[in-house]
Every structure is written in structure tokens, then in C-alpha cells.
């Protein structure tokens, strides 16, 4: 049977993460952002057609994917969030197709410096790199997290072997990641916010021209967002499968309370 999740209960990926994921499990989902790797679950978003095959007992057959290590070191600076880390990685690998149809495996000493919800925020955005799936090594943070939704038995330690071979590696020093923004028309079109503010007119004009070359009908107007030399923000949204994490909602609540 099915499980009905009311809209006021959870963002659906947060619900699946909390209630269905587990270390060493695999989940096939219809949504492209099906990613629960931070809890040791290989989750793949394949679309409704593939899911329908599962409902009638068919197998899910794929060739062995390549595996790329995402080697994390350091610790994020204050104010740098999971979306900043994710966008930095997406911006580095997307155009080159470096992780396309591969598994991104997050390892390294920097993993221990990230709370689980922080890892979730990075993990769910790996879809935008065109990777097939993503998985993280698990640790004490993972073990401490799973009893919160009432599933301590879902924990298993997952780590690379002492000698592990990969098809590639992306080295990320978390201490160097800056607050980052993605501009239209794809999350790979990234800039450090400091760079965008310093060169707002040039960057937004280039982005506007590229975007309008891709769309028909109403044209994108970014230049009007520059007011008095600053960039005007119309709306702040904390939601969705990446931004709508519990930690993010709490952080925004704290900011609004002053």
C-alpha cells in the first residue's frame, strides 16, 4: 500500500530520508532529486516509468557506474551553508561532465565536520552535477542522528577500504568555500557572492543575454535589479528538498527573531 504524507508534515525528501533511508540500503524514486546518500543510502531518481516497472516486479538493471571520490577536508566558515558547498562543486564539474552518470562518494576528514542536515543539503543537490547517485561515509554523527526519527537500527558504519580505487577525485577544502549564488539558467552558473556584488552590472548583463538567447516570449530582466549600485532581492525562499531542511528553517527563525 501507499503512504500519504500531508503537506504540513514534511518536504517529501526529508520524510523519505528520516523514515525510509538506512545505511547500506538502496531506494529508487521517481523524482530526480532522490538523494539520501548522507545517511548511507544509495538513492536514484529514475522517473515514473522505471518505478512502474518495479511495481510489477521487474528488475532495475544498470551497468556498473564509475565512482568519483569527493574528498572533503577542513571546516566551513561561519555563514557558509550546504548550498554554497554544493554550488561550488556543481560549478566545477558540470561543464566538464566529470561525474556524469557516476556515483559521487563523499569521503575524507572534512565529513566529520558537517552535521547530518548540512550533509543532506549538499547531497540532494548532486543531481545537478548529472551524476547517477551519491553516497557518504557514515560516522558517529550518522549514528547519533538516526535515533531522532526513531530508527537507530538503520545505522551501519560505512567507510572506504584502507586501499580504495576510484575513477576520479574532486578535492574540496571546505574552509575555502565562499558564499555562492547560482544565476539563471542552471545551478552550474555560479559565482561567489562577493564577486557578483563587485561586478554586478557585467555579470548580470552577461547572464541576461545568455538566458534570453535560450527562452522565447517574455524576456528576463536582471539589470533592473541593480539599484543604487546594490542588487535588489525580491524574495527569500527557504523551502524545497535542499533548502527546506530542519536546520535551515531553525536558522532563518533565529535570524528573524534577531
Predicted regions and their residues:
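Fe-S-dependent hydro-lyases/dehydratases of central metabolism
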Residues: 1-258
Amino acid at each position: 500500500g501507499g503512504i500519504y504524507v500531508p503537506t504540513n508534515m514534511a518536504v517529501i525528501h526529508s520524510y523519505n530520508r528520516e523514515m525510509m533511508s538506512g545505511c547500506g540500503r538502496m531506494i529508487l524514486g521517481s523524482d530526480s532529486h532522490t538523494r539520501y546518500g548522507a545517511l548511507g543510502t544509495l538513492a536514484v531518481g529514475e522517473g515514473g516509468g522505471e518505478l512502474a516497472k518495479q511495481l510489477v516486479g521487474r528488475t532495475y538493471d544498470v551497468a556498473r557506474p564509475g565512482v568519483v571520490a569527493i574528498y572533503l577536508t577542513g571546516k566551513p566558515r561561519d555563514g557558509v551553508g550546504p548550498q554554497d558547498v554544493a554550488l561550488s562543486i556543481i560549478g566545477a564539474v558540470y561543464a566538464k561532465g566529470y561525474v556524469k552518470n557516476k556515483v559521487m562518494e563523499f569521503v575524507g576528514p572534512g565529513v566529520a565536520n558537517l552535521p547530518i542536515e548540512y550533509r543532506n543539503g549538499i547531497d540532494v543537490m548532486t543531481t545537478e552535477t548529472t551524476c547517477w547517485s551519491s553516497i557518504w561515509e557514515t560516522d558517529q554523527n550518522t549514528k547519533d542522528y538516526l535515533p531522532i526519527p526513531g530508527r537507530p537500527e538503520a545505522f551501519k558504519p560505512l567507510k572506504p577500504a584502507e586501499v580504495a580505487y576510484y575513477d576520479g577525485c574532486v578535492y574540496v577544502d571546505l574552509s575555502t568555500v565562499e558564499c555562492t549564488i547560482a544565476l539563471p539558467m542552471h545551478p552550474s552558473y555560479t559565482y561567489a557572492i562577493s564577486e557578483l556584488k563587485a561586478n554586478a552590472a557585467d555579470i548580470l548583463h552577461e547572464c541576461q543575454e545568455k538566458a534570453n538567447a535560450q527562452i522565447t516570449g517574455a524576456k528576463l530582466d536582471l539589470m533592473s535589479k541593480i539599484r543604487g549600485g546594490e542588487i535588489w532581492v525580491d524574495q527569500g525562499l527557504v523551502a524545497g528538498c535542499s533548502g527546506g531542511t530542519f536546520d535551515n528553517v531553525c536558522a532563518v527563525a533565529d535570524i528573524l527573531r534577531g
